[in-house]
């Protein structure tokens, strides 16, 4: 296995170090190459993501990312120039966000309900393609547009992936959209789910408007198994899903090229938290959970399950104890 590591900014290097510690414990001998990308490189060289680095990243099996973002860099420079560029250059058309409430983790929902679903979010289309513009900026007559792009090809490959995941799980898929208002894009998503669903007669299909889905994610999250949705709606509901499962500090994600032509990238959802960087108190659990996703994607299912069980044991027994970053990594690695 050849792994590229982008530790990034803030707490990124700290949590990534613990994730790598767990990876080495469960799968020894991984070839690792670290890339200095983020605020430090930007300030030193003016570069965000050189073409040469993109070419090198393509030669790896996967990418492990820590966190990107620093208040010393103008807003959007790293987010668009690094994170979004990687997504489009490496065709990460699926953003995978598991949502599971682990034993021992407090949910803001009463009764700690059973929550275990996954959101399959389209990652390269929708309103995030940069298709739009503005005229008469700064005047009372300013007009700004953001065009949401949805292609039959792009929608179908994400829907097909979601059905495959539903078949391997509890055989239930929910399409989340807003078809009563976004009739053109929504119609494409609905037709595609119907067409692809014919190949999966064992998977039950449901539809919910995005506003209804947010309500049910709070009042009845157990109804969801696999959710498939577009880029914008997915961006919103995945953070809500993280909130009901204990917060983004316990949320992992995968940015996936399902064709495997390019390396997929795995990362914790949380930000770079520069206010606590260097103090050794950042929780690396989400970064370690990202390792489990990475291993599963690469077919190392037994190793992925071992990491997940070790994380579950850690969360179930940690109580209110505040552990140092390195202690969390050691504890989870020891439980493998």
Swiss-Prot record:
Its EC number is 1.1.1.85. Binds 1 Mg(2+) or Mn(2+) ion per subunit. The record marks 128, 178 as: Important for catalysis. Mg(2+) binds at residues 211, 235, 239. This is 3-isopropylmalate dehydrogenase. GO terms for biological process: L-leucine biosynthetic process. Pathway: Amino-acid biosynthesis; L-leucine biosynthesis; L-leucine from 3-methyl-2-oxobutanoate: step 3/4. Pfam families: Iso_dh (PF00180). It is an enzyme of class 1 (oxidoreductase). It comes from Mycobacterium bovis (strain ATCC BAA-935 / AF2122/97). It catalyses: (2R,3S)-3-isopropylmalate + NAD(+) = 4-methyl-2-oxopentanoate + CO2 + NADH. Belongs to the isocitrate and isopropylmalate dehydrogenases family. LeuB type 2 subfamily. Keywords: Amino-acid biosynthesis, Branched-chain amino acid biosynthesis, Cytoplasm, Leucine biosynthesis, Magnesium, Manganese, Metal-binding, NAD, Oxidoreductase. It is found in: Cytoplasm. It comes from the Bacteria. Homodimer. InterPro entries: ICDH/IPMDH, IsoCit/isopropylmalate_DH_CS, IsoPropMal-DH-like_dom, LeuB_actb. NAD(+) binds at residues 271-283. Transmembrane segments: none annotated. GO terms for cellular component: cytoplasm. Catalyzes the oxidation of 3-carboxy-2-hydroxy-4-methylpentanoate (3-isopropylmalate) to 3-carboxy-4-methyl-2-oxopentanoate. The product decarboxylates to 4-methyl-2 oxopentanoate. Signal peptide: none annotated. GO terms for molecular function: 3-isopropylmalate dehydrogenase activity; magnesium ion binding; NAD binding. Substrate binds at residues 87, 97, 121, 211.
């Amino acid at each position: 296995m050849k792994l590229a590591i982008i530790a990034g900014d803030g707490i990124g290097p700290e949590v990534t170090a613990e994730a790598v510690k767990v990876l080495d414990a469960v799968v020894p001998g991984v070839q690792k190459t670290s890339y200095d990308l983020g605020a430090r490189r930007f300030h030193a060289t003016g570069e965000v993501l050189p073409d040469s680095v993109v070419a090198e990243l393509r030669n790896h099996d996967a990418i492990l990312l820590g966190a990107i973002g620093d208040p010393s860099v103008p807003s959007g420079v790293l987010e668009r120039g690094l994170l979004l560029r990687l997504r489009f250059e490496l065709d990460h058309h699926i953003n995978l966000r598991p949502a599971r409430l682990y034993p021992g983790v407090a949910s803001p929902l009463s009764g700690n309900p059973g929550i275990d679903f996954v959101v399959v979010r389209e990652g390269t289309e929708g309103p995030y393609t940069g298709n739009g513009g503005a005229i008469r900026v700064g005047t009372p007559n300013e007009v700004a547009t953001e065009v949401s792009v949805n292609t039959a090809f792009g929608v179908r490959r994400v829907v097909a992936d979601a059905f495959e995941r539903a078949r391997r799980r509890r055989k239930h898929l929910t399409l989340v959209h807003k078809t009563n208002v976004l009739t053109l894009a929504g119609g494409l998503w609905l037709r595609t789910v119907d067409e692809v669903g014919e190949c999966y007669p064992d998977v039950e299909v449901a539809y919910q408007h995005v506003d209804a889905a947010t309500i049910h994610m709070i009042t009845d999250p157990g109804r969801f198994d696999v959710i498939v949705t577009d880029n914008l709606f997915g961006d919103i509901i995945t953070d809500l899903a993280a909130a009901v499962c204990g917060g983004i500090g316990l949320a992992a994600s995968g940015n996936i090229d399902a064709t495997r032509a390019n390396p997929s990238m795995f990362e914790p959802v949380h930000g770079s938290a520069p206010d606590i960087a260097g103090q050794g108190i950042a929780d690396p659990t989400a970064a370690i959970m990202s390792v489990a996703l990475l291993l599963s994607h690469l077919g190392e299912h037994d190793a992925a399950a071992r990491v997940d069980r070790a994380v579950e044991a850690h969360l179930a027994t940690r109580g209110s104890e505040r552990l140092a970053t390195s202690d969390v990594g050691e504890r989870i690695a020891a439980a493998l």
